[in-house]
């Protein structure tokens, strides 16, 4: 590094660290004094006096009783001395604490249009603060204890003159209640000290200057305990009155009925405040509770008596904040992704509007948490005979819209509970529909996919607006919790007989998206506004999704599948286990009819399996078969015999 680069860097470091090269020259600068040097600790002159850093003028924080100081400083090693004179301006800011005396004040309390006057003997502490030739007197009235000679509670926390707000905090006797104190602690009487400020040029009383004849109810029972001499008066938030239910009215100087001056020591000393733990007794309706409070301690010692004042610690005030639990954001629409049949869907948290998409048969959908208003739309599918419809619970305003599908004979319809308008949606015969709980408005949107018989659909939880999309047959739907007004709109998809449809929980708008079989879908967390997805109109798939490998050869195609489903249907060509149905392009068509038969067996279209088509059956070169994997939980368990059965079936077809 070059020298030209080192010097500026060193200079910057020196300035930043506050290090100054001592100046021992005899030249007098504008911001320094003869023989004075600057260091990290502040200023120090030749007389050995240390001053705070930052006082560069002739005014020092130290108070000098004299106006000039002569000192000699050896400047050269030869012993020559040079005399200098420094001007020290006496500080005009100081605080004087007078001795502790007693007086009798009158405390006026008003409640319900009646006022009561109580004479209380209190201690008086007068603090005189002089700031820039402005004299301010603070008179603090503190409750006395039964043993004033040993312990009392005057408020005498003094603030240095440099602070704009003198500390004059008074804590009621209840905050310093020793075991031997006879502090009045009743529901009708409260000894609340009044802090008063009487400056020479301006008078700023404590938090409230309330004369004896005027009563100001204190809503929080906080006595006036801190006074600012200038134009502000800051009440002490830590003051704990004896009685929590009584009103506090600070008394001003005019409320003193009699003033008894006791022996006043000539001198008093204020010791630096410390902290201690005292026991505070709070009484309400003849019941008292004891709590420990950490307070500041100011000890005033005189010739004969030591007065200890317990003052609140303002620097460590802890304001209790009500617990704010952050529940799942209610009213947030949640968009559920489709669930594969045989899948258990966990709905979004309660209070979240969920958009229900159609559920594939065999799927069990759990609705969103309760508390969301649900809007039920009428089902447009006729109800098969023998269907039992249960209307919404009573007390729930339901907007009934006409069902566009006739109800099959033999259907038992249960009307809504009294006082609850219910809109009945047609249910396919054999279907048991349970309406949303009372008090929850449910808006059901028509399901675009028919629900297979024996399907039970579980709607979103109550309190969440649920928009029901079509449910695939075989699905069990559980409605949302009651208490939400339900607006039933007709469902556009017929419900298969034997299907039990449970409406969405009241109050939770849930829009369910179609669920693919075999998939367990967890809906998006509540509180996230989601778009309303349009239900998929895919044909219901009654098989569990599995991973399938289709191998094409010159003569036949082999399908290896792993599935945990049970054979549910047997087409003309034979029984195919659920989860093995595949829509295949003819991979190795040996002849046209076989290919058609092979594809006709798989009536359920599966878009995730694709194979390459060979132009003619005579070609021997077969391209590698494409392998596609279904998204589902069925691929976890591998059972080879299912694959062999499917392969044999395809081979014979």
UniProtKB/Swiss-Prot annotation:
The keyword Ribosomal protein does not apply. GO terms for biological process: adhesion of symbiont to host; cell adhesion; cell-cell adhesion; single-species biofilm formation in or on host organism; single-species biofilm formation on inanimate substrate. Residues 633-653 form a propeptide. One of its GO terms (cellular component) is side of membrane. Glycans are attached at residue 323. Keywords: Cell adhesion, Cell wall, Glycoprotein, GPI-anchor, Lipoprotein, Membrane, Repeat, Secreted, Signal, Virulence. One of its GO terms (molecular function) is cell adhesion molecule binding. Residues 326-541 are annotated as: 10 X 20 AA approximate tandem repeats. Residues 147-254 are annotated as: 15 X 6 AA tandem repeats, Ser/Thr-rich. The N-terminal domain mediates haploid invasive growth and yeast cell-cell adhesion. The regions containing tandem repeats are required to project the N-terminal region into the extracellular environment and to mediate adhesion to polystyrene and to host cells. In allele CaO19.8979, the N-terminal tandem repeat region is expended and contains up to 90 repeats and the C-terminal tandem repeat region has one more repeat. Induction: Expressed in white cells. Transcription is regulated by the transcription factor EFG1 and up-regulated by alpha-pheromone, by host serum, in biofilms, and in high iron conditions. Repressed by BCR1 in a/a biofilms. Cell wall protein which mediates cell-cell and cell-substrate adhesion. Required for biofilm formation and plays a role in virulence. Residues 579-590 have a biased composition (Polar residues). The GPI-anchor is attached to the protein in the endoplasmic reticulum and serves to target the protein to the cell surface. There, the glucosamine-inositol phospholipid moiety is cleaved off and the GPI-modified mannoprotein is covalently attached via its lipidless GPI glycan remnant to the 1,6-beta-glucan of the outer cell wall layer. Sequence repeats lie at residues 147-152, 153-158, 159-164, 165-170, 171-176, 177-182, 192-197, 198-203, 204-209, 210-215, 216-221, 222-227, 228-233, 234-248, 249-254, 326-345, 346-365, 366-389, 390-413, 414-433, 434-457, 458-477, 478-501, 502-521, 522-541. This is Cell wall adhesin EAP1. It comes from the Eukaryota. It is a lipid-anchor; GPI-anchor. Residues 145-267, 341-353, 361-538 have a biased composition (Low complexity). It is found in: Secreted, Cell wall; Membrane. Residues 1-18 form the signal peptide. Belongs to the PGA18 family. Residues 144-267, 324-540, 572-595 are annotated as: Disordered. Residues 19-146 are annotated as: N-terminal cell-cell adhesion domain. A lipid is attached at residue 632 (GPI-anchor amidated glycine).
């Amino acid at each position: 590094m070059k020298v030209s680069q080192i010097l500026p860097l060193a200079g910057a470091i020196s300035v930043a660290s506050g290090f100054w090269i001592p100046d021992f020259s005899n030249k007098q600068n504008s911001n320094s004094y003869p023989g004075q040097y600057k260091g990290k600790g502040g200023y120090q002159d030749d007389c050995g006096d240390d001053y705070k850093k930052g006082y560069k003028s002739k005014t020092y924080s130290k108070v000098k009783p004299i106006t000039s100081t002569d000192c000699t400083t050896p400047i050269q090693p030869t012993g020559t001395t040079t005399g200098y004179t420094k001007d020290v301006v006496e500080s005009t800011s100081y605080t004087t604490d007078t001795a502790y005396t007693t007086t009798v004040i009158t405390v006026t309390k008003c409640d319900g249009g009646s006022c009561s006057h109580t004479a209380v003997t209190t201690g008086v502490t007068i603090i005189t603060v002089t700031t820039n030739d402005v004299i301010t007197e603070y008179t603090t009235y503190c409750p006395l204890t039964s043993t004033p000679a040993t312990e009392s509670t005057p408020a005498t926390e003094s603030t240095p003159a440099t602070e704009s707000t003198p500390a004059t905090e008074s804590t009621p006797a209840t905050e310093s209640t020793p075991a031997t104190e006879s502090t009045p602690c009743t529901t009708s009487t409260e000894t609340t000290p009044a802090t008063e400020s009487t400056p020479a040029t301006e008078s700023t009383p404590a938090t409230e200057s309330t004369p004896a004849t005027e009563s100001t109810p204190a809503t929080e029972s906080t006595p006036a305990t801190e006074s600012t001499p200038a134009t502000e008066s800051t009440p002490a938030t830590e003051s704990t009155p004896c009685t929590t239910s009584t009103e506090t009215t600070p008394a001003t100087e005019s409320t003193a009925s009699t003033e008894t001056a006791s022996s006043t020591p000539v001198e008093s000393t204020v010791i630096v405040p410390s902290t201690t733990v005292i026991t505070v007794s709070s009484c309400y309706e003849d019941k008292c509770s004891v709590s420990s409070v950490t307070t500041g301690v100011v000890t005033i010692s005189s010739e004969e008596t030591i007065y200890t004042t317990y003052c609140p610690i303002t620097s460590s005030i802890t304001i209790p904040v009500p617990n704010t639990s952050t529940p799942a954001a209610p009213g947030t629409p949640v968009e559920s992704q489709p669930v594969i049949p045989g899948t258990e869907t966990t709905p979004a948290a309660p209070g979240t509007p969920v958009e229900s998409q159609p559920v594939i048969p065999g799927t069990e959908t759990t609705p969103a948490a309760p508390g969301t208003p649900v809007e039920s739309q009428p089902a447009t599918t006729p109800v098969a005979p023998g269907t039992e419809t249960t209307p919404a619970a009573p007390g729930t305003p339901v907007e009934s819209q006409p069902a566009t599908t006739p109800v099959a004979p033999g259907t038992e319809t249960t009307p809504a509970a009294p006082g609850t308008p219910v809109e009945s949606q047609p249910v396919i015969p054999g279907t048991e529909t349970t309406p949303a709980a009372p008090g929850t408005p449910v808006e059901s949107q028509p399901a675009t996919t028919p629900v297979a018989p024996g399907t039970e659909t579980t709607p979103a939880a109550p309190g969440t607006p649920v928009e029901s999309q079509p449910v695939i047959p075989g699905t069990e739907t559980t409605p949302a919790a009651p208490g939400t007004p339900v607006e039933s709109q007709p469902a556009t998809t017929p419900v298969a007989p034997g299907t039990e449809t449970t409406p969405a929980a009241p109050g939770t708008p849930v829009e369910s998206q179609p669920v693919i079989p075999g998939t367990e879908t967890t809906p998006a967390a509540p509180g996230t506004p989601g778009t309303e997805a349009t239900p998929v109109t895919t044909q219901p798939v009654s098989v569990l999704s599995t991973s399938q490998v289709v191998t094409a050869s010159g003569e036949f195609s082999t399908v290896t599948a792993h599935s945990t489903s049970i054979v549910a249907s047997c087409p003309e060509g034979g029984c195919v286990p659920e989860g093995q149905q595949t829509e295949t392009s003819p991979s190795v068509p040996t002849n046209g009819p076989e290919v058609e038969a092979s594809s006709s067996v798989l009536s359920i279209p599966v878009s995730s399996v694709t194979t390459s088509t060979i132009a003619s059956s005579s070609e021997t070169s077969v391209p590698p078969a494409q392998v596609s994997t279904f998204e589902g939980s069925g691929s976890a368990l591998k059972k080879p015999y299912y694959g062999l059965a499917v392969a044999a079936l395809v081979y014979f077809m």
